Amino acid sequence: MGAPEPSWCFLFLPVLLTVGGLSPVQAQSDNYPGCECSSVSPGVLAGIVLGDLVLTLLIALAVYSLGRLVSRGRGTADGTRKQHMAETESPYQELQGQRPEVYSDLNTQRQYYR
């Protein structure tokens, strides 16, 4: 099978420290002898990590399910809107040939504003 990937090695580190009789928090506090920090047991630390993973998965599942519900609702509204637009006339006016009287009318109005 080969050696585990580097990310898996970090997951085994707390287990190895616990088997060795040293919790991960105690290993860090040994580096700072003046620190009077309360130690966290490995069970509490594992509970925090697992709880975080479970909550993250629940949030992802909720976002996914809500996303599917919203897209279904929009799909039906778009379908009826497209059918309604097909039944009515086009909102655009068709182009007609050049009409010089429109432009000549604009030129006469411009003289009044000068």
Swiss-Prot record:
Q: What GO CC annotations are associated with the protein?
A: cell surface; plasma membrane
Return the annotated site residues (Important for interaction with transmembrane receptors).
T56
* Listed InterPro entries: Tyrobp (IPR026200)
Q: Which residues cross the membrane?
A: 43-63
Cleaved signal peptide residues = 1-27
Its recorded name reads: TYRO protein tyrosine kinase-binding protein
Briefly, what is this protein's role? Adapter protein which non-covalently associates with activating receptors found on the surface of a variety of immune cells to mediate signaling and cell activation following ligand binding by the receptors. TYROBP is tyrosine-phosphorylated in the ITAM domain following ligand binding by the associated receptors which leads to activation of additional tyrosine kinases and subsequent cell activation. Also has an inhibitory role in some cells. Non-covalently associates with activating receptors of the CD300 family to mediate cell activation.
Primary gene name: Tyrobp
Membrane topology per record: Single-pass type I membrane protein
What is the phylogenetic placement of the source species in the record?
Eukaryota, Metazoa, Chordata, Craniata, Vertebrata
Q: Which GO terms describe its molecular function?
A: identical protein binding; metal ion binding; molecular adaptor activity; protein homodimerization activity; protein-macromolecule adaptor activity; signaling receptor binding
Record's subcellular location:
Cell membrane
* Example GO BP: positive regulation of receptor localization to synapse
Cytoplasmic topological domain ranges are 64-114
Q: Where is this region: Disordered?
A: 72-114
Q: Give the organism, scientific name.
A: Rattus norvegicus
